[in-house]
Amino acid sequence: MTRALVIVLDSVGIGGAPDGAAYGDGGADTLGHIAEACAEGRGDRPGLRAGPLRLPHLAGLGLGLAAREASGRMPPGLAPDGPVAGAWGHAVETARGKDTVSGHWEIAGAPVDFDWGRFPATRPSFPPDLTRALIEEGNLPGILGDCHASGTAVIEAYGAEHLRSGKPICYTSVDSVFQIAAHEEAFGLERLYALCGIARRLCDPYRIGRVIARPFAGSAGTGFVRTANRRDFATPPPGDTLLDRLAAAGRPLVSVGKIGDIFAHRHTGTEVKPAGNDACLDAALAAFADLGPGGLVFANLVDFDTEYGHRRDVPGYAAALERFDARLPEIRAALRPGDLCLVTADHGNDPTWTGTDHTREQVPVLAFGPGQRPGPIGRREGLADIGATVAAHLGLALPAGRSWL
C-alpha cells in the first residue's frame, strides 16, 4: 500500500500573491528576494555562507520553475540543470490571512472560511476585560507588554522587569495570536503552560487562532534567549482534515515539529517534537522508515520562519535553505515504490521585507517519488489541493481541494 511524507518548509513563499497588496505585501517574495540578495553579495556571512544561493536539488524538482510561474521571474541560480524530477506547481491560499494555522489547515483540506480575530496595533492592544480575567485567573501581579511586538525584541525590552516583578510579557502581532513570554526558571515552564491554557479559553470568544507559550532563559547581564520549549495552543480545525480521515481509517500517522500544536492535538497520531530543522527532519525520516502501509508522516520545519524570517536574517535563511537542499538526496533515498513526498510551505516571511511579520505569498508545491509523474501541475487555486492529492494517493477522500493525480 502507498505511503506519504509531507514536509512544510515554514514560510518559504515564492511571491506572486494576487491579493498581496491588500495585506501590505505587494511584491513580497521570500525565495526570490533571498536569491537576489545572495547574487548581489548581501547573503554573505563569514563562517556561515557566501555567494549565490545554491539549491541544485530543489531546482531539479522544479522550485525555480514554480517560483517563476508564481512571481513572473526566475530566482537567480534556480533554473533546473536538466529534466525536472518531480511534479511542480504553485498554490494560492484561499484563507483571508497569512498565518501558520490557516496555511496548515488548508494544506490538510480544511480551509478557513471565516475571519480570525486580531488585536489592534495600539497600546494597550488587548481588551481590558481579557487582561483583567487573565490576571485574576492566573493569579498574576499584572502583565507587561500589551502591544504588538517582535518576540526577540519584547524579551529584550521587558525581560529584566519581568524578573523583578513576576509579571509575564504578553504581546501580539498582525496574526491572530496571543503570546506569553516568561522565564523558564524564574516564572516556571509548567506555570507558563498553565497560564496559556487559561488564555486559550479566554481568547476563544475573540476568535484568536493561537495562544503561544514563549519561554526564555538568561539574565539582564548575559542577555535573554528563547528556548526550544515553545508550545502552541490552537483552536481545533473547523472541519474534517486529512488527519481526521486517516484516524477514521485506522491509518498510521506521525506528526513532527509543531504539527500537533497546530491541529490542537486532534487525531495527530504519534507526536514527535525535536528542536531545529535538522532534528525534525531526522525524526521525520526515522518515522517514515518505520511507517506502515497507508500512513503519513507530516512534518513542519519551523526554523526558516522563527529563526530567520521574523528576524529578517537573509544569510541565515539562505544557509538554512541550502542545508535542507543538501539533505534532499537522503529524503529521496528513503522513498520506496508507491511512496509520495510532497514539499510545500504555509505562507511567506520575506527577510528583505519591512517589519517582522509574515508576508502574503503563493507557496511552492513539489511532489516526487518512485513512479510519480514529473511535470507541471500549474497554479492550484487553494492549498487544499495538496491535502486532496495526498488523500487520493492514500485511497482516501477530502471534502475540499482537487487532486492533480
Swiss-Prot record:
The entry lists its GO molecular-function terms as: magnesium ion binding; manganese ion binding; phosphopentomutase activity
Mind telling me which HAMAP family this protein's record contains? Phosphopentomut
**Which reactions appear under catalytic activity for this entry?**
2-deoxy-alpha-D-ribose 1-phosphate = 2-deoxy-D-ribose 5-phosphate; alpha-D-ribose 1-phosphate = D-ribose 5-phosphate
Enzyme class (EC, first level) = isomerase
The reply to whether Isomerase figures as a keyword in the UniProt entry is yes
Asked whether the keyword Ligase is assigned, the reply is no
Documented EC number(s)? 5.4.2.7
**What are the subcellular locations of this protein?**
Cytoplasm
| This protein's UniProt keywords | Cytoplasm, Isomerase, Manganese, Metal-binding
* Name the record gives this protein: Phosphopentomutase
Tell me the protein family, please.
Belongs to the phosphopentomutase family.
Residues that coordinate or bind Mn(2+) 2: D305, H310, H358
User: What organism is this sequence from?
Assistant: Methylobacterium sp. (strain 4-46)
Cofactor binding notes: Binds 2 manganese ions.
**Gene3D superfamilies this protein is in?**
Alkaline Phosphatase, subunit A (3.40.720.10), Phosphopentomutase (3.30.70.1250)
User: What are the recorded Gene Ontology BP terms?
Assistant: 2-deoxyribose 1-phosphate catabolic process; 5-phosphoribose 1-diphosphate biosynthetic process; metabolic compound salvage; nucleotide metabolic process
Q: Which domain of life is it from?
A: Bacteria
Q: In which pathway does it act?
A: Carbohydrate degradation; 2-deoxy-D-ribose 1-phosphate degradation; D-glyceraldehyde 3-phosphate and acetaldehyde from 2-deoxy-alpha-D-ribose 1-phosphate: step 1/2
Q: Which GO CC annotations does the UniProt entry carry?
A: cytosol
According to its UniProt entry, what is the function of this protein?
Answer: Isomerase that catalyzes the conversion of deoxy-ribose 1-phosphate (dRib-1-P) and ribose 1-phosphate (Rib-1-P) to deoxy-ribose 5-phosphate (dRib-5-P) and ribose 5-phosphate (Rib-5-P), respectively.
Q: For this UniProt entry, what is the primary localization, expressed as one broad class?
A: cytoplasm
Task: Detail which positions bind Mn(2+) 1.
Answer: D10, D346, H347
User: Which cofactor is essential here?
Assistant: Mn(2+)
Q: Which residues form a coiled coil?
A: none
